[in-house]
Amino acid sequence: MTDFDLMNFPFHERLDSPVSENGEIKDGEPIPQNWLNENHVGKSILPLFVNPEDVINCNFSNARDSYEENKSPSMDQMNYARNTSYQESPGLQERPKNEKDKSPIGTDVHKKDVPNFIHSTPRENSSKHFTRANEQASAQPTDEHTSPDISIEDCNGAKIFLQNSLSKEDFRMLENVILGYQKKVIELGRDNLRQEERANSLQKELEAATKSNDKTLDNKKKIEEQTVLIENLTKDLSLNKEMLEKANDTIQTKHTALLSLTDSLRKAELFEIPIGILFFDLYDSEENSSKLDHILQEKYPNIKGFLCASQQEELSRISQRFKNAKAEAEDLRNELENKKIEIQTMREKNNTLIGTNKTLSKQNKILCDKFDKLTIDEKEILKGCNEEIKIKLERLNERLGSWEKSKEKYETSLKDKEKMLADAEKKTNTLSKELDNLRSRFGNLEGNTSERITIKNILQSRPDISAEECNFLMVEQIDSANLTTLQNTVKEIVLAVGIPYPKLRRKIPLLAIKLKYENIMLSNFAQRLHRQVYSQEMNLKKFTDQAYYDFMSTRRMDSIDHHLERCLDHLYDHILEKMVK
């Protein structure tokens, strides 16, 4: 057996022994020819090194001696004694008396030399009878004068000591197990007789096999590396799948929220104008500008602007935040696609490794069938391969540590991505709140559109006003004026006429009557009277310009020195003087 075979031992499987768990031999079932080679190697190797004749002749206890004296040798024992020459195995040896008082430290040091496949492999099912006997022996009180301890030698010559204070039932159970193995050894002896005739041909095959042994060792190394790599890749793949599913769910929710945000923003209107589409036109444009002025002026030439400058700056900031959020979402989507591509490549590598592993396992099976027949050379190869196996296991442990470090790096990177997603979610929430606030402010600024005064309403409510007069007065241009201009105009009117704002709409007709009728009639009367008295007209335009100049220089209505007042005073004094005379 080579180190290549040991690396492929099915240590985790249970030994399919013809001896049942209760110690009875299954005589009804035939023992296969290659039972030892196929099922026993690597699973429970300890009974191979137990000589049943030593166990029968060993003095375990007084009860055992009396039992052996009255018991006749069985057919299996006689067959085993006849075929002992074909089976080489170390037997049970009595522990020397001078080793009884040795400290347990020496025993522990001695056990360290035992190969790893004896001490560390899980063979709970196959060695159940030995462990059960040891547990019952440890529970019973010991006596100083009991029979000496028993030691078992492994393939390297190292001794493994067993407890000897066992009961009669435990020894019967042990005997049944040993007899079962005797039966297997007898069958193997018969096979060895048949195989002896083919020794010459097998010797030639052995020479060819030794030449290809180096290639087999290389293949074995590749299989070891690939199996460990496949296991690590499958674990990493499962973890990456779970993390990617979580990331996909979070990104999907963020994407749906972003789509709903873009849809609501696309449907946004201002003064019956689809202003939301303008944001997307600006985003799709090649110019690196964050202002909607040129796009708005191209589509709606009559519109000069919306709201004040501060609110426009606020809207531009909101659009910039929206662009940043969209860019971050696109980056996350691209990163997710890259992760999917990496997982696909890893999956393809895994499939290729599985295929190579299958082919190598087939080759391994063919070589194992040849090497199983060469039991003598197996022991020599086994001794030289123990150190190599230890070195390889250390290398595999180092690789496992590196894979764990890379796994931790992936986990930290995924946590960072989750934090970025949480920050993006917070940003989208703040943007949605700001958008709702802007919508509410837009609604308050727009007011009730059903009460808006249009040219149609003017023509219906004022028959004295025509459409040409409305065009001359540029009434429609008022609808395109911004809020600040309209507010300033109304304030100037209120301050100029001295009427409170709540009474302004009600007293506007009175102002119109005074301006269009009463003031004109009074000015005509004064002009006619002045012409009659002085034979010339008053220069009212000059008086008005002088009063306007005084107001603009002082910005005070009470400080205007209107020349019309002096002119009318002189006219009144002159008429009064004429009337008195």
UniProtKB/Swiss-Prot annotation:
GO terms for molecular function: structural constituent of cytoskeleton. It is found in: Cytoplasm, Cytoskeleton, Microtubule organizing center, Spindle pole body. Residues 86-150 are annotated as: Disordered. The gene is CNM67. Residues 179-252, 306-363, 373-451 form a coiled coil. The modification Phosphoserine is found at S17, S20, S72, S85, S89, S151. This is Chaotic nuclear migration protein 67. It comes from Saccharomyces cerevisiae (strain ATCC 204508 / S288c). GO terms for cellular component: central plaque of spindle pole body; cytoplasm; outer plaque of mitotic spindle pole body; outer plaque of spindle pole body; spindle pole body. Interacts directly with ADY3 and YOR129C. Interacts with ADY4. Probable component of a SPB complex composed of ADY3, SSP1, DON1, MPC54, SPO21/MPC70, NUD1 and CNM67. Phosphorylated in its N-terminal part.
